A protein has these predicted regions:
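Composition-driven recognition of glycine/serine/threonine/acidic- and proline-rich low-complexity segments
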Residues: 1-195
């Protein structure tokens, strides 16, 4: 991977930071590199999730794009066009790379998630919050570990933050508009078969 990053001009020896050419404008080759890095990392996260839940995890190829704030909002609206969501974000930083992982859960999936996690009682708001934090920690932690290992650079992670529960996506976007700007976005959709 280092050879590819060097060839694309995304990494310079002696410079511990990953950059993109011309700001955040990605070439097709650079997008392919990020997509492959994300694909391997999400595969590792999905493997952990499948073993934890005892189910098969369906994974499409990750979608990698540089998005302006308005495009990010449109992408989030498109991903969650129906119903309400709960969202968690967690910041990370290391070797000149900084970002935020954002996990969105469709609220309709909490009953299935509780069942898969072996919860036998009623699914209260407190239980939903615990499930939300547990799943976010698993997905974000495993993904970032896989991503960092490929780049051979450790990431420090901040504490996860709940952006909102049981809210329309537009409310989540408006409440967090100041957090996002032109961004390299990697969209990953995890689905558990039969749930």
């Amino acid at each position: 991977i280092l050879d590819v990053l060097l060839r694309l001009g995304l990494y310079q020896p002696g410079q511990s930071e990953l950059t993109t050419q011309g700001g955040l404008n990605l070439t097709v080759e650079a997008r392919d590199v990020y997509q492959e890095l994300a694909n391997v990392a999400m595969g590792q996260a999905a493997d952990l999730l499948a073993r934890m839940l005892g189910g098969f995890v369906i994974l499409p190829i990750p979608n990698v794009n540089v998005l302006e704030v308005s495009e990010l909002h449109m992408a989030l609206n498109s991903a969650a066009s129906e119903g309400t969501l709960s969202a968690v974000c967690q910041g990370f930083i290391g070797a000149g790379i900084a970002g935020e992982a954002l996990v969105l859960f469709h609220d309709s999936s909490f009953a299935d998630l509780a069942h898969l996690m072996g919860h036998t009682g009623s699914v209260t708001r407190a239980v939903e919050l615990e499930l939300l934090m547990d799943m976010s920690n698993v997905l974000i932690g495993a993904f970032l570990r896989g991503f960092a290992n490929q780049l051979d650079t450790p990431f420090s992670q901040g504490h996860p933050t709940v952006l909102g529960q049981h809210r329309p996506i537009e409310d989540l976007i408006q409440a967090n508009r100041h957090r996002w700007r032109r961004t390299l976005a990697i969209e990953i959709n995890y689905q558990i078969r039969d749930h």
